[in-house]
Every structure is written in C-alpha cells, then in structure tokens.
Amino acid sequence: MEKFELIAPCHFGLEAVMKREILDLGYEITAVEDGKVTFEGDAEAIAYANVFLRTTERILLKVGQFRAETFEELFEKTRALPWERYIPKDGKFWVTKANSVKSRLFSPSDIQSIMKKAMVERLKTVYHIQWFEETGSSFPIRVSILKDVVTVGLDTSGVSLHKRGYRKLTAKAPITETLAAALLMLTPWKKDRILVDPFCGSGTFPIEAAMMAAQIAPGMNRSFLAEQWKHLVPRKHWYDVMDDAASRVDLTVETDIQGFDIDGDVIRSARENARLAQVDHLIHFQQRPVSELSHPRKYGFLVTNPPYGERLEEKEALPELYRVLGERFRALDSWSMYLITSYEDAQRYIGKKADKNRKIYNGMLRTYFYQYAGPKPPKKRTGE
C-alpha cells in the first residue's frame, strides 16, 4: 500500500503530547520539530489521524520539501513536484496559507501567487490542457518556509480539527479544544479520578475530559476535506475508521467531572455544548464563584483556564481572584491543580510556587501551564 508523509501541526511546547498520540495509533514518527510532528502512514492513516487525534490542528499530506532563496527557485522547484499524483484534472487547487520565518522569501501573497502559477504550469504539461475549470474537489495547499526551507502540504482536514462539532455557544476568551485536550494529557488525571474546572466557561475542559473518559473520538461528528479525495483515500477507509471509532464509545462510563462558573448564562452554554457532544450526562455544571470551591472527596484535580485580564478593569481584579483560587486550592489539601494563564503574577497571588511551569504559545499569546502535583491516592488492597 502506498505510503505518505503526514504532518500534524500542534501548539508550540506540546510536541511530545502530539508524538505520543501518533505512536498510540501505531504510526512511525519521522521528525519532531517546533510546532509539528511528521509521521509515515498509508491512505487509511489519513482517516485515522483526522478522526482520532485530539491535539493537532489539522493533518497535512506532505507533497515535498526543498530549499529556495529566490522566487525563481521557488517557481522551478514547485513545478518539479508531482502534483498530478494528488490533484486530478478537474481539481480546485490554491495556496490557502503561506508563512515564512527567518527566510529571504517573506511575502505571503507573492509566495502564494508564484506557487499557484508553478502548479498550473506542471499540470498543463501533464494533462495537456491550457485551462483548468476547477469544478471538482478542493485541494488547499499550506506552505511554511523556515530558514529558506520550503515545506509544502495538502490540507486533508479542511476546517481546523479543534472544531469538533459541539461548540455552538462560546464564552469569552475560550480555550481551543485541541489545546484543552493536550493539557489534560499532560496531567496524570484518569477517568476514575475527580476533575473540577472552577472557571469552566463554555465547558471545554470538562467536555474534552468526558470525551476521553467515554472514548469518543474527537472527529466522530464532523467531516473532512479528504473524504472527497476518492483517488487518494478510498471511501471504504472512512467507513471503516468511523465504525472503529463508534465501536470504542462507552457512554456508561462512571466518572466525576464538574464545571463551575460565576456566570449563569455561560453555564447554560456549557450544558448545551456538552449535550451536543453527547456527554452532558457525564458532567455536572453549576453556577458557583471560585470563593465557594469545595469538594468532599480527596485526591481530585483542578484543571482550569482562569481569566487572563486582557482589559484594564479585569486586570485590576486578578490579584484577588488568584489569591482566592490559591486559598481554595490549599483547602483541598490532597488535590492537584493545573492551570493555563498568561498572568505572570499567578504564582505570587496563588501563594505557592508550581512544581512545574511549562511555557506554551496559545496562538501568538505566551501562556504558562502551572502544575501543582498533589499526593497520589493510596493503592487499594487486593480483594477490595
């Protein structure tokens, strides 16, 4: 079966999580770089990666990689790529995004235009036609240039994979589903342990945790661009992968996941999002301020995305908010806490230095993932 190189972009700082997910699917990693993991897989792997990977933004099919320091080089080397292997005669194709870092070629619009012309020239020669109707399936191309090395990939996903199909209602400053899933994977939380988000917003952390607990694949309720590419990914692969995903779901799983927020409207949005994700029965949402945070059980997890204070009036309220969060966390003496924030004084007002502090870029925003590890619960005796 034909093999492809596939690229899974991810948040900077979370490449190890992405790598682990891909290995768990059984694919061979060929490269790990800042913000992306490359692996080898067949046509079925394109379907599996899109449906099952929780932490990537999209899956790119690598068309080629080359060095280019001039637009002439870019044109010639783009034209030399085997575009006919991927794009049929009636295909609609364009460079949807180009980014350049530390490279001589830096104008995205020029890069896009020149590469499209080169692709057209190649396909005109191969297909013996002068004009492309482009009435068939879509083939968007994404290009990244780093230190003059051009990487070219076909976007197999279409709409970003963080869009699972359940978030219809959004709270202010939401965390993306892919980032929330990756952060949950950085914690030792398992489905038999308590998880509480005291600033749950539209419910992303609780919903992603519940989907993991119920083994609901993140791409089960959406479509993908490569479903149109029958010559590359036969329809049978998509049916088989979706059947596999459906067979793993366990909606009867027992788990204790809770989400609190001071805003009642936000809680209603979170409940609706959970319903659309088919996990509303697994999560308890409640309107509650962080000052009332408590739980009768031990050895739980707080996983949260507190307010960052992007506006001045919000920033002035942050010291007290983080002080109260730290106070309530200390009252939960056997618990662990994991929070992502861009607020640099978070540890100071929480009143305790984190055991680990990981820098993560949420888009262009530099954030910190503070990790406070609590004690492990005692092991159950045999026969209990």
Question: Which role does the model predict for each range below?
Answer:
Residues 44-51, 159-162, 378-380:
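Short, charged/polar, Gly/Pro-enriched secondary-structure boundary elements
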Residues 96-98, 144-186:
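Class I S-adenosyl-L-methionine
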Residues 2-137:
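Non-catalytic nucleic-acid substrate-recognition regions in nucleic-acid-modifying enzymes
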Residues 289-384:
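C-terminal catalytic and target-recognition region of SAM-dependent MTase-like enzymes
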Residues 100-103, 160, 307-311:
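A short, flexible beta-alpha/helix-coil linker loop
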Residues 175-295, 310-311, 315-317:
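Conserved S-adenosyl-L-methionine
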